[in-house]
Amino acid sequence: MHTLPVKTGTRPLAQVQKLIPGLLLSAALAGVAILLGRSQWLQHNGISALTLAIVLGILVGNTLYPRIAAGSAAGVGFSKQILLRAGIILYGLRLTFQDIAGVGLHGVLLDALMLASTFGLACLLGTRLFGLDRTTTLLIGAGSSICGAAAVMATEPVVRGRAEQVAVAVSTVVVFGTLGIFLYPALFQLDQDWGLLPRDPGTWGVYIGATVHEVAQVVAAGRSIGIEAADTAVIAKMVRVMMLAPFLILLSAWLARDKAHRRQHSGATKITIPWFAVGFVLVAGLNSLVSLPPALVSHVNDLDTFLLAMAMAGLGLGTHLSAIRRAGLKPLLLAALLFAWLVLGGGFLTRLALA
């Protein structure tokens, strides 16, 4: 009687081993990005670890990575898909529902109006004026209207964008968000004579938080005006970030209905609920209702930054510069018009809401 050897757990172990090279590469790039992100100069200019991670990923992805891609692709894919979702869920720990009270009803309405109008304008201009594909348009719109690179990354699973489409959207956020760091303090000084907005730093903080792309960029722009402006700007920005989850759910439902219309209702269309967005809200709710130890929150936020940086590095590794060049100037022009709306339209609506 012959007995066959039992290889219990061999296949799962082999699958895990396939992930290790890509995970180590993504983790190494994320670690370097986080260390570089601690530079005072980079922090002052609002350049976050997430931005640095995708830049490093693109540099390595277009030089050394093609030689090792075969052995690393599985882990890199895991980083930009699974770890991304985990990072978005943990991002909720940075927020509390009490933040909403910090900006008041008018501030919340301003955030919601800027989100809806900016995203709607992106959809209109991107596909009709510039003739961009819808996925790139939606990603640029999400990044401009909510919270920059994190919003682009969170929207990608819903719209199923390609790596180069995500990279193009993130690059527009970096360009115009960085420009905003220098523009808003200059506008604040000019407005001391013009008087278009109330001169108090708190109002300018809400204006900045409701219109600047990235959280790091909001902090940098607000601090250039003053501590009060920076604190208010961060609260207004966090309220805007909190709108990410309902935005993703509504976007998923809208895309499902749109597909059904294009297929002339030929079959049942499933609305995909982005469960990581639900997890984001649940974690924010937990943070609002339960007083968690500050040390624990700090460590989890550090872990979250690392996971998101790994996801951004993974995205960069899969991005080909030739594909970005083929996209041309149209994505940048769309982002420029959205930035103009955020600055001008946002200032007008801030005056109406808070004056």
Curated annotation (Swiss-Prot):
Principal location class: membrane
Membrane spanning residue stretches: 20-37, 44-66, 71-93, 100-122, 137-159, 166-188, 233-255, 275-297, 307-324, 331-353
Subcellular location: Cell membrane
Topological category with respect to the lipid bilayer: Multi-pass membrane protein
ATP-binding as UniProt keyword: no
Family stated for the protein in its record: Belongs to the UPF0324 family.
Gene Ontology CC annotations of this record: plasma membrane
Record protein name field: UPF0324 membrane protein PA5383
Naturally occurring in which organism (per UniProt): Pseudomonas aeruginosa (strain ATCC 15692 / DSM 22644 / CIP 104116 / JCM 14847 / LMG 12228 / 1C / PRS 101 / PAO1)
Lineage: Bacteria, Pseudomonadati, Pseudomonadota, Gammaproteobacteria, Pseudomonadales
Entry keywords, A to Z: Cell membrane, Membrane, Transmembrane, Transmembrane helix
InterPro entries, sorted: UPF0324_pro, UPF0324_YeiH-like
PANTHER family, sorted: INNER MEMBRANE PROTEIN YEIH-RELATED, UPF0324 INNER MEMBRANE PROTEIN YEIH
